[in-house]
Structures are given as C-alpha cells and as structure tokens.
Design a protein with these regions (language model features):
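HotDog/MaoC-like acyl-thioester-processing domains
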Residues: 1-12, 73-76, 87-147
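Hydrophobic beta-strand-centered segment that forms part of the acyl-chain substrate-binding groove
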Residues: 45-94, 112-114
C-alpha cells in the first residue's frame, strides 16, 4: 500500500456530500461508493475544465483500470473532498491519482482513501483509442505532478 497522501499532493478538489444510501450494513460508506466518488471528480474536471462534451462529443473517456486503498472509515453525514491529480499523461490515456479527504481536516492529514483511475480516450462511434483532445490535454497538463 502506498504511503498516505495529503491534500498537498493534489491539484484539484471537488466537494462530495455523503448520502444516507452510501452507508452499508456496517455503518460506514460502502467500498464501491468510493469508485463513484473517483468517477465524479475525474469527470467533473474533464467537463468543467477540459470542455469534454460527454453527451454529443466525438471523443469520450473510458475507465480501463482502477484501484482504491481504504485508510479510515467515513459515514453519512460526513462531508468530503475528492482530490485529483495526473500521475501520467500519455497520447491516448491518462492515469489519475485520486484521494478522498474528510472536510475539516488540516492540510497534512492523510486521505481516508486513495487510488487511481486510468482513462483511455476513444472515438464515441467505434470505441477505438484516439489522441486526447487538445483542450482536454491542456487542462490535464495543469494537474500533472512530478514522479
């Protein structure tokens, strides 16, 4: 498991409001819900900052790999923030580092969960890999962190 990440390790943040339905029988947010949070922050960034048109644009991003390490439980009604960065920016794909933080934490408090997503950009019609659109690439470039 990678070392715990802090907010300082991320470049973009999105508030996440937990919902009653996110909790499972054990009284904490269920593991699958974290992937929804990951997907939400990545796509929010692509749409709002990169101009990706998910409804009619010729290019879309598909998740081809994901992982998550859980470090501390959260539960409704916790308020969270999802942190996003770019760990690797290729010609047709991007690897995001993503972490979830409990709001109210200080800057150096560790993430409650952290992981990654790999998006491959494809032609909407035939699903073949294509180059990341220039506007999207420019936005992603702002999130790149040094290895």
């Amino acid at each position: 498991m990678a070392d715990p990440q802090t907010r300082a390790d991320y470049r973009y943040f999105l508030p996440i409001t937990t919902r009653w339905m996110d909790n499972d029988l054990y009284g904490h947010v269920n593991n699958v819900t974290y992937y929804s949070y990951f997907d939400t922050v990545a796509n929010h960034f692509l749409i709002t900052e990169g101009g990706l048109d998910i409804h009619t644009g010729p290019v879309i991003g598909l998740v081809v790999e994901s992982a998550c390490s859980y470090r501390a439980p959260v539960a409704y009604p916790d308020e969270l923030s999802a942190g996003l960065r770019v760990d690797k920016l290729g010609n047709r794909s991007v690897t995001y580092g993503i972490a979830i933080f409990r709001d109210g934490q200080v800057t150096d408090d560790p993430a409650v969960a952290q992981g990654h997503f790999v998006h491959v950009f494809v032609d909407r019609a035939d699903r073949r890999a294509v180059a990341i659109p220039d506007q999207v690439r420019a936005a992603l470039q702002r999130l790149v962190v040094a290895p």
